[in-house]
Amino acid sequence: MTEMKLIPRNEVEEKYTWDMTLLYKTDEDYKASLENIKKEILDFKATYEGKLTDHATLDTAVKKYEELYEEYYKLSHYAELPMAVDRFNDNVVQNMTLFEDISTIWAGNLSFFDTELVELDEQFIKDFVKNYRPDLEYYFEKIVQEKKHTLSKEAEQVIANYESLPGYFNLYEVTKHEDMEFDSFEANGKTFENSFVLYENLHGMDNDTEVRRKAAKSFYKTLNSYKNTSANEYISQIKKEKMLATMRGYDSVIDYLLAAQDGNRELYDRQIRTLMTDLAPHIRRYIKLLAREHKIEDMQFADCKINLDPDFEVDMTIDESRSYLKKALGVLGEDYVKMIDESYDKRWTDFPQNIGKSTGGFCATVPNVAGFILLSWTGKMNEVFVLAHELGHAYHFMSTGKHQTMLNNDCPLYFVEAPSTCNEVIVSNYLLKTNTDTRFKRWVISNMISRTYFHNMVTHYLEAVYQDRIYKMVDNNEMLTADVLSKVKRDVMEEFFGDSLVVNEGAELTWMRQPHYYMGLYPYTYSAGLTIGTAIANKIDNDSSYADTWLNVLSKGSSMSALDLSKLAGCDVSTDEPLKEAIAYVGHLVDELYNLTDELNK
């Protein structure tokens, strides 16, 4: 393996970091905007509170609110994104603190707007939408649906103030990135450093079993030392969610969270149920193939991320990735390729691994500015899939920003991972077409399973099942502790993986690794999105002109429900057919892996 040490942020190459000057040229400009929006917030409250009584006033209020929200959105990203890459920088922390002050002012003074919209007469709203804002039809439909769950203006203001305060997620991030210190470990006579970033991106997928397992032992030893702190943070978070659900009249915290993300309980339950029964057998076969080829008799959870063919890894530089992505995603059209070029030319992506940087990857798009992407580049080809994934988010929300107003700039969470996962499948299909070598083909398919499907349909799905069971325990007032959380996680893992592996000691603490548990019911949306993404990518593979249909869907933002968006894309998720087809596709890929491996072993 390649030994790696994390370096301080000030030692990374600037050309591979994201450019915050796309938002504000200087900190002084940022601070001036903070002062300006503070005044604008107070003026908005003074001008419109209690006065949304006629269509003309409501129209000007909505437009002004959208202007404020767009600037607030820029401010939030200028504050939060540097924290994700350099959280030990005092200036970065100070800028975040300044934004948190404005966030409190925003929440305390503008909560009236949502409350007064909900209180408007339904016919008044319909006439307003028809005559003034037909583009916000679905937005106001959701407003009407919220009526029975909306509290008094005073209560909503208290909740808004409370929600604006730094919460349990902040505590989780501090514990994870600032307090945890990992012991180095020895393997094969060498000493290796360990950290969250190093384990997640390097050691956990090392092809040397001794390195991999010693790293896991070191990693989980540290997690175990903080399990009670992390459990307290997480349990407090879900108790807060249960409290809000009860206040708003929901019997189940799951229904409350689904409503908040424009979700559908039937689709949610089907996703949770079907993947356990139908996908698990395919994944077990894949893991057994890994064990067979690596001659591992006691396959463990810590071994799941190894490559099927460890001697066949494709190296990839950051600069080379640009050409690959333009060719692979070129099927999506000229505008898509232009966006890829822009993302490199204008430094949308933060590539380096450094001390104080968050783990994982994400894309945070500021409409009409940039899709800021966080990665931890490892120099391997599989990072191209990660970047393709995040560029899918970037194009989606840049397109939404171009075609929709700020109130339609969101996206139903059930659909949000479709554009990103679709890109991963498109890249795989491109690679399979351009290189027919048997060993390369096996590498691509193996990567599809281990990166695209295992990550999105297994890792995040197991998070979702765990969440589902914990939330149901909260609904039933059952006691939760660190040990209870760990037992539930272990039970979920053992049920899914069956006899294909042993859940090694410490792996039950996997619930401490992901931030998604502080984001409502986000984890299940990965498998939901990949269900849609698989269908769309294969449609485009069969008929490249279908890309135009897909790009049109990506311009709709939150102006439609997830069901309607998927239907417009030609993938009707109101039935279980797309999910069943996606699972069958995974089974087909596993069959291909067995066939190709047997052919290569002859």
Language-model-detected regions and their locations in the chain:
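Post-HExxH zinc-binding segment in Zn-dependent metallohydrolases
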Residues: 411-440, 449-451, 455, 529
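C-terminal, non-catalytic "cap/extension" segments appended to globular domains
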Residues: 10-12, 25, 113-118, 138-150, ...
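Active-site recognition of the HExxH zinc-binding catalytic motif
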Residues: 249, 378-398, 420, 425, ...
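Hydrophobic alpha-helical scaffolding
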Residues: 23, 158-161, 205, 212, ...
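Conserved helix-loop functional segments at active or binding sites
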Residues: 327-338, 361-364, 393, 397-405, ...
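Glycine- and acidic
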Residues: 20, 204-219, 256-272, 304-313, ...
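His/Asp/Glu-rich acidic catalytic environments and adjacent acidic regulatory segments
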Residues: 1-50, 74-262, 270, 274, ...
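Active-site-proximal, well-structured secondary-structure segments within enzyme catalytic domains
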Residues: 132-136, 184-198, 228, 232-376, ...
